[in-house]
């Protein structure tokens, strides 16, 4: 009797393990499919940027073109080489400085509203949340930025409007609230101030959250072309995204008007230029992202659940 029970238990265990393996296999298959769908546009753009314009005109974009060429990149860097390098420099400066400023403002604001005994914390939290619900409109924002804050044709115009993202601020607040309050309480008893507590105790424990919002802000500054479009007229302050946007618009205009003097003598890469511009714009992100991916995943998960 006992042997029969053991036999039945073993069979049930084997069936459970078998079903778990099947579910795991299906799960991995779905993940692989999602990864393939996600990476396909990047690979497609990369291959398309090396495809000759004439080949694309005749055959369209393909994953395995019979001809490869650097003519699109040659055109881009030959016509806008210096401006591209200068715009890259502007984007790097704006991204580094802007990210540092935004992380500082976000972390300090989040810490203030996460302090347990701070009576005005709820008021500061609501003030930030209110800006997510309502705004003064584009015209009021533009007038305040240009006429009253002097954010016109300078690098500050590309940094200060994005000083704090409320979503990132609440993400950091959730991190801080998820930490044991006993750490802060014991530090206060020992005579430590809030600056010391924040820099020596809180920030080292919230490293994943800081890396997460740093990535968010870096992507925001690097990919932005709205602020240059609205606040920049001087081309020496153009960022890489905006100058690529203008370049693509100009090429599409010339390609749509073949009677112009320039377009009549040159075959413009009107189609492949989109692919090349995409690769130029996202190249630095693709290089950096794998090194901070683990912090990004951990930060989003923990920050969203705690608090």
Residue ranges and their predicted role:
Residues 2-3:
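Polybasic, lysine-rich low-complexity intrinsically disordered segments
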């Amino acid at each position: 009797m006992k042997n029969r029970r053991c036999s039945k238990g073993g069979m049930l265990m084997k069936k459970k393990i078998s079903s778990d393996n099947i579910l795991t296999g299906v799960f991995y298959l779905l993940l692989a499919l999602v990864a393939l769908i996600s990476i396909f546009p990047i690979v497609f753009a990369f291959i398309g940027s090396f495809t000759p314009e004439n080949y694309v005109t005749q055959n369209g974009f393909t994953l395995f073109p019979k001809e490869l060429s650097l003519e699109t990149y040659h055109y881009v860097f030959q016509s806008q080489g210096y401006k591209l390098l200068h715009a890259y420099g502007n984007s790097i400066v704006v991204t580094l400085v802007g990210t540092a400023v935004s992380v500082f403002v976000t972390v300090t604001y989040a810490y203030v509203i996460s302090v347990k005994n701070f009576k005005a914390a709820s008021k500061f939290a609501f003030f930030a949340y209110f800006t997510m619900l309502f705004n003064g409109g584009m015209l009021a924002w533009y007038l305040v930025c240009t006429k009253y804050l002097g954010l016109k044709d300078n690098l500050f115009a590309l940094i200060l409007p994005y000083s704090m993202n409320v979503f990132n601020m609440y993400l950091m607040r959730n991190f801080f609230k998820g930490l044991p309050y006993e750490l802060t309480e014991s530090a206060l008893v020992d005579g430590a101030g809030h600056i010391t507590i924040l820099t020596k105790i809180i920030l080292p424990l919230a490293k994943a959250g800081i890396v997460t919002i740093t990535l968010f802000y870096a992507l925001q500054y690097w990919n932005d072309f709205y602020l240059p479009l609205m606040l920049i007229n001087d081309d020496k302050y153009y960022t890489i995204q905006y100058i690529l946007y203008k370049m693509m618009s100009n090429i599409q205009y010339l390609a749509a008007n073949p009677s112009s003097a320039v377009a009549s003598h040159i075959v413009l890469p009107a189609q492949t230029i989109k692919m090349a511009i995409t690769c130029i714009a996202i190249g630095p992100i693709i290089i950096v992202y794998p090194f901070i991916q683990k912090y990004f995943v951990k930060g989003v998960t923990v920050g969203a659940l705690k608090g």
